[in-house]
């Protein structure tokens, strides 16, 4: 199923975490739309700010390290410059050593891109993944996608 086929993903109200990111002139393609690289940068900004927010609001989780294992993107329409982008995020699923973030990019209340990103919890020492500690699992659960 495509991300856009889930009606929860098309409304910004179902995402528990939000931030507004301004667009830049350098984000524009020849057709005066936000280019695909800029769209991925906006998703990245959402992921980074969300994980930073988790560390600030849930000090018991410490400083977990995550790696992007997979990203899927649905482009629904063009993003516009100079309009700000409303980046919305929720936790779509929690596994034993990873979690899936559900992200949406909105302008003027309308979704123009959706993404799912699987984040793997990295082991503190050496290569490989590590189980999600209970404090981190609980913090992630607070941001479950409605």
Report each predicted region and the residues it spans.
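Catalytic strand-loop segment that frames the active site of acyl-thioester-processing enzymes
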Residues: 2-49, 53
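Helix-adjacent hinge/juxtasegments
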Residues: 65, 69-91
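Short, flexible helix/strand-to-coil boundary loops that buttress conserved ligand/catalytic motifs
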Residues: 54-55, 144
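HotDog/MaoC-like acyl-thioester-processing domains
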Residues: 2-19, 75, 79-81, 92-146
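Short, basic/aromatic beta-hairpin or loop at an interaction surface
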Residues: 58-66
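A broad, structural micro-motif
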Residues: 34, 66-68, 112
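Residue-level signal for pocket-adjacent positions within structured domains
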Residues: 23-25, 29, 61-62, 127, ...
């Amino acid at each position: 199923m495509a991300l856009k086929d889930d009606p929860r993903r098309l409304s910004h109200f179902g995402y528990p975490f939000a931030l507004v990111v301004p667009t830049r002139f350098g984000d524009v393609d020849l057709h005066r739309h936000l280019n695909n690289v800029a769209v991925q940068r906006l998703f990245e900004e959402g992921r980074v700010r969300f994980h930073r927010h988790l560390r600030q609001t849930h000090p018991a989780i410490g400083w977990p390290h995550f790696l992007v294992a997979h990203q899927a993107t649905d482009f629904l329409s063009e993003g516009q410059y100079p309009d700000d982008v409303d980046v919305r995020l929720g936790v779509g699923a929690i596994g034993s050593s990873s979690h899936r973030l559900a992200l949406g990019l909105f302008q003027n209340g309308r979704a123009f891109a959706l993404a799912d990103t699987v984040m793997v919890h990295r082991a503190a020492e050496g290569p490989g993944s590590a189980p999600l500690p209970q404090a981190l699992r609980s913090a992630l659960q607070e941001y479950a996608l409605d």
